[in-house]
Swiss-Prot record:
The pathologies of several chronic and acute diseases of the respiratory tract involve an imbalance between the proteases of cells involved in inflammatory responses and the inhibitors of these proteases. The inflammation-mediated release of neutrophil elastase in the lungs of patients whose levels of active alpha-1-antiprotease are compromised by genetic background, cigarette smoking, air pollutants, or a combination of all three can result in severe lung damage and a decreased lifespan. The gene is SLPI. Keywords: Antibiotic, Antimicrobial, Disulfide bond, Immunity, Innate immunity, Protease inhibitor, Repeat, Secreted, Serine protease inhibitor, Signal. Acid-stable proteinase inhibitor with strong affinities for trypsin, chymotrypsin, elastase, and cathepsin G. Modulates the inflammatory and immune responses after bacterial infection, and after infection by the intracellular parasite L.major. Down-regulates responses to bacterial lipopolysaccharide (LPS). Plays a role in regulating the activation of NF-kappa-B and inflammatory responses. Has antimicrobial activity against mycobacteria, but not against salmonella. Contributes to normal resistance against infection by M.tuberculosis. Required for normal resistance to infection by L.major. Disulfide bonds join 35-64, 43-68, 51-63, 57-72, 89-118, 96-122, 105-117, 111-126. Residues 1-25 form the signal peptide. This is Antileukoproteinase. Changing residue 97 to K/R: Strongly reduced inhibition of elastase. Abolishes inhibition of trypsin. Interacts with GRN; interaction protects progranulin from proteolysis. GO terms for molecular function: DNA binding; endopeptidase inhibitor activity; enzyme binding; mRNA binding; serine-type endopeptidase inhibitor activity. GO terms for biological process: antibacterial humoral response; host-mediated perturbation of symbiont process; immune response; innate immune response; negative regulation of protein binding; negative regulation of viral genome replication; response to lipopolysaccharide.
Amino acid sequence: MKSSGLFPFLVLLALGTLAPWAVEGSGKSFKAGVCPPKKSAQCLRYKKPECQSDWQCPGKKRCCPDTCGIKCLDPVDTPNPTRRKPGKCPVTYGQCLMLNPPNFCEMDGQCKRDLKCCMGMCGKSCVSPVKA
């Protein structure tokens, strides 16, 4: 097979592989609740992630960080969601290639102490703010 005939085949193969990922979560806006807090325990062996986004989890479950990896877990109600903490989120340079990265928080009120919920390179997480 000539290289010029191979190119269209490779393009079609790539599109066929990526198409299901592109529509993942389409038509769905938001799953209620937030991920439960991680248990303060040491992990001896990390497990392969069960999911990469909420839409890969059945029903109301969300894709959440757990003690030894990322799993589909039952969400909990949002604690004090309206509380906005002082400071600004640090500037993030770059972005991961994951289509729907898991968010470890949605709002400042979900973060402990003075941490803020900020968009990072790969989803939202609780981080130390920079002074405004």
